[in-house]
């Protein structure tokens, strides 16, 4: 279970990971689905909150040459985020866009409790779907 927590946490940061595959593998090995869901959701939510913290911290360096986003790019991202609002964090589960959304929430200083709630809902839903699909499609193979 600790390995699932770590893989889920790393998968939620800007580092690559394969938490869905590991979750399905542990389910096939007979681990309880509810426990797998809770551990993966907690790890992935914590990883998302690490991204929020990185966004909050990184904003102070935006004038540095090495900062990864241009002033125009950051302004464009802020306009997009303000247009769709904090509810866009419900897409934090999605590959490619989810991690940058959590960083952007930090850059724009979304209150911690709201970031935590929205990210937890998104990540929990993601792993519920993964477990449902594993139970439906992988059961004959396990």
Please annotate each region the language model reported.
Residues 1-5, 28-100, 104-142:
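Membrane-interfacial helix-loop-helix
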Residues 10-19, 91-98:
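Short helix-coil transition sites and intra-membrane helix breaks within transmembrane domains
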